[in-house]
């Protein structure tokens, strides 16, 4: 899988960019939120990427930030939401706005995004509830820093929701290494 590309920006044709990485040109689809923040053609850039393989195409999607890529990955797991719609959602609202809309169960905000209907918005709210807050910086998530943030990410990646992960973090000692903290948190969650 291609996780990151760094190279010279050759072309900007919304929502696609052409990136030259050591003589190889990569066409990368980017959400408009990232597109507007790109430097001028000829400048060096780095994009975090998601590689999607379909029967008829191999596509690269690029993101300026890790939370943006995490949101994209979460969105494409939802039934009826493909990469194109996920890109549209991330182009229509910031990652923080998306996390906030999901945390507050605001379908009306999601319906404003082109291509997202009432049913899709309700499905997004249902399937992403409790999964995006800490990943994407929603204000309802637990405030953590340093090793605790890494432990929280690990717990969320293992499928625990925000509430469970936050409860496990409270059981940890103040100064703990990430690997030990994950073990402690998992023990706390299994009690």
Swiss-Prot record:
GO CC terms, sorted: cytoplasm; Holliday junction helicase complex; Holliday junction resolvase complex
Which portions of the sequence form the region Flexible linker? 140-142
Gene Ontology molecular function: any one: ATP binding
The UniProt entry, under Gene3D superfamilies, shows:
5' to 3' exonuclease, C-terminal subdomain, DNA helicase RuvA subunit, C-terminal domain, Nucleic acid-binding proteins
- What is a biological process (GO) this protein takes part in? DNA recombination
Cellular localization per UniProt: Cytoplasm
- This protein's major location comes to cytoplasm
Region entry Domain III: which residue ranges?
Answer: 143-191
Which portions of the sequence form the region Domain I?
A: 1-64
Lineage top rank: taxon: Bacteria
Question: What keywords were assigned to this record?
Answer: Cytoplasm, DNA damage, DNA recombination, DNA repair, DNA-binding
Provide the residue span(s) of the region labelled Domain II. 65-140
> One Pfam family name from the record?
RuvA_N
Domain topic, free-text comment: Has three domains with a flexible linker between the domains II and III and assumes an 'L' shape. Domain III is highly mobile and contacts RuvB.
Q: Which family does it belong to?
A: Belongs to the RuvA family.
Functional note: The RuvA-RuvB-RuvC complex processes Holliday junction (HJ) DNA during genetic recombination and DNA repair, while the RuvA-RuvB complex plays an important role in the rescue of blocked DNA replication forks via replication fork reversal (RFR). RuvA specifically binds to HJ cruciform DNA, conferring on it an open structure. The RuvB hexamer acts as an ATP-dependent pump, pulling dsDNA into and through the RuvAB complex. HJ branch migration allows RuvC to scan DNA until it finds its consensus sequence, where it cleaves and resolves the cruciform DNA.
Q: Tell me, how does this one assemble?
A: Homotetramer. Forms an RuvA(8)-RuvB(12)-Holliday junction (HJ) complex. HJ DNA is sandwiched between 2 RuvA tetramers; dsDNA enters through RuvA and exits via RuvB. An RuvB hexamer assembles on each DNA strand where it exits the tetramer. Each RuvB hexamer is contacted by two RuvA subunits (via domain III) on 2 adjacent RuvB subunits; this complex drives branch migration. In the full resolvosome a probable DNA-RuvA(4)-RuvB(12)-RuvC(2) complex forms which resolves the HJ.
What name does this protein carry? Holliday junction branch migration complex subunit RuvA
Which gene does this sequence derive from?
A: ruvA
């Amino acid at each position: 899988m291609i996780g990151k590309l760094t190279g010279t920006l050759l072309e900007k044709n919304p929502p696609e960019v052409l990136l030259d990485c050591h003589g190889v040109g990569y066409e990368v689809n980017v959400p408009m939120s990232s597109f507007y923040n790109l430097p001028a053609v000829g400048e060096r850039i780095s994009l975090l990427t998601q590689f999607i393989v379909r029967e008829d195409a191999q596509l690269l999607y690029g993101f300026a930030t890790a939370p943006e890529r995490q949101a994209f990955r979460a969105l494409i797991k939802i039934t009826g939401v493909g990469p194109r719609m996920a890109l549209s959602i991330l182009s229509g609202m910031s990652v923080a706005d998306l996390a906030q809309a999901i945390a507050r169960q605001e379908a009306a905000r999601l319906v404003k995004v082109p291509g997202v209907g009432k049913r899709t918005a309700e499905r997004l709210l249902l399937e992403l509830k409790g999964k995006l807050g800490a990943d994407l910086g929603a204000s309802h998530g637990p405030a953590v820093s340093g090793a605790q943030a890494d432990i929280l990410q690990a717990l969320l990646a293992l499928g625990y929701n925000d509430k469970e992960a936050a409860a496990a973090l409270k059981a940890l000692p103040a100064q703990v290494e990430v690997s030990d903290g994950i073990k402690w948190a998992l023990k706390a969650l299994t009690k």
